[in-house]
């Protein structure tokens, strides 16, 4: 999806020569910071730490839907993130540098009388979190929906064996942005204008419908 949006942006900015290079998350982040790449996109969220290293267009490209992975036997009790907080459910740890950590921290700031216990940890993988929820050590795991689909829901997913015992509860959308090298201020401004035009003329909405079957912007207004 985001590549398709950036291809549409490229058509609006023919004064630049565009070369699209598939790469890993780490190489993208390091490459844009170092200048190896001018701009990058890969479901990137804006965080204070990233704003120190990169510049962002004002307009987002799309949104990542984020939510809770819970056991099916808890589905009658936990139907939303508010239910997790009300029941004092245990949320699996999140690495403090992970943007998902900020999602829960922001939720707790907005709900000071009904906080979720936010535990930080760096020594685990997605498979650990899924297993912990399955075993009952934790009641929920905060996960990006696309990751849940790729890791569990799809038939060829690596942890598809958990699919009949886990469910996904949507919480909200997090804006995703193009990431620009700090020296490329003019390019960032022009990309921002192009994204704004693509949203106004309906191009981005059409691409969201094509790739996701719905508009993701509605999820950005949820608190």
Where are these regions (language model features)?
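Extracytoplasmic small-molecule ligand-binding "clamshell" domains
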Residues: 1-44, 201
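Flexible hinge/capping segments at coil-to-helix
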Residues: 71-92
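Short helix-initiation/N-cap motifs at beta->coil->alpha
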Residues: 18-30, 76, 117-131, 135
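A ligand-binding cleft/hinge motif common to bilobed small-molecule-binding domains
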Residues: 27, 33, 41-53, 102-106, ...
